[in-house]
């Protein structure tokens, strides 16, 4: 089971308790989630489910949404409110420069997926060879202390309010839960069995050097998880890189071995918002690297401003070409920061200071395999302090 949703979204927060309840009642302990909002920010600026012509930063990556729908969710039109034939469908430009149109999936949506399913379980007539989306539940509601509800809107899309100026609410808890329960009844009636995949499975498959490792202490994290971890107390070790990068592939076994030996997890963050799949597999020219993309490099500089305040690299110190990024902060000041070259491994403690008492959260870093020991030593020193 997969849910397209985000913790920033009030509709997601409304759905989650009900979805979790029915999943537990039916013995489903894992629901895989994905968010089309690149930085999970509530302002929606990096939301990629946008049609060409939109003004937010995410529209530059709307092909990521389009390709996922076109290549994998091929029958999603049968299950959503705004399929590709409606005015609210999503248009994007493919790798060949052609305009494509796909259905507009609302967040949140929960669905049962099997890429090899050949049975059409929807009530729509279709002659496809496969129907990977076996069942989907897409209903937009909100939640308060009294339950689930929808708001009332006028013909122009404005909220209808009562005499006190509060939005008019129509509570629908029982109806909503009954509709969601149908998905779980479908699971039981059709004896659907779920296959579980873990982050470790992903790491082993995408990093061949770790395929047969006795233990894997490399834990992949999303952008939001990375930003959150950097704000937590205590010591940690992080690695920046991705499976597309040969240098990361060459070093990751050594990093994992040292992590296992030191009984510590290393959190691996990929600076590509698409894992470089758009370039390597789909033929797009636009880069998904947040350090190189003008439209979303603020995601990278935000990490530096908020957490990685003493970040530096050898190439940055030597003034090498391409080793820095210049931008203007919220105050309009021009800043220049280092660009990380994968793989980059560092030990971190948000409260660490240097010998002069100045904040220095990155306590050690490594850009080469032969300097990894310094990172693990700094981590160990931080633990014993």
Per-region residue spans from a language model:
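Extracytoplasmic/secreted proteins, especially bacterial periplasmic and envelope-associated proteins
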Residues: 10-21, 63-71, 75, 175-182, ...
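Short, P/G- and charge-enriched loop/turn segments at secondary-structure junctions
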Residues: 95-99, 328-335
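Non-catalytic, surface beta->alpha helical segment in thiol-disulfide oxidoreductase systems
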Residues: 100-194, 335-385
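N-terminal "domain-start" segment that seeds a small globular fold
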Residues: 178-181, 185-225
